[in-house]
Amino acid sequence: IAFAVPTGTVKGFHMAAAHSDSPCFKVKEKPELTVEDHYMRLNTEKYGGMLMSTWFDRPLSVAGRVFVRANGEIVEKLVSVDRDLLVIPNVAIHMNRTANDGMKYMANVDTLPLLGGKESGGILPIVAKAAGVAESDILGSDLFLYCRGEGTLLGENEEYILSPKLDDLECACGCLEGLLNAKESENI
């Protein structure tokens, strides 16, 4: 919620609203899952209403916040691992011949992202390095997956915008731009 208070008497309200949450996968605490002693996946859960199929076979990473011990206090640090780190792989067609007949995804089984081999050190050391803190100082986290694909213009005349989470973020951006560029008035 953001607003500007006029300097004089308030005459009324001008409002704009947009949801700013973006459906994604939230990383659970202690998320590392070693599968069949071969590879490591992250335990995640769905956040918001989403089209799960759009998350498959794309470069993903992790961003959010960590809570760290610093000088006797608990402080929050924003963090983004700025590299292609994870993928939610589709099963090859020869392993699931009915994949093109429509899939029903189970988030707790089918959409767990692949992090690395069984010798992977897990996600916490990677997040700690990105945050510039010692792994032992991290007390908790609030981390989410995000798609690393960049937005682009497409179409014959570049008349279309293609970008992950566009429907959520453009609404929030439009409201913020409106607030920042509004002329001072007698309304909140």
Outline where the language-model segments fall.
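N-terminal hydrophobic/helix-forming segments and targeting peptides
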Residues: 1-188
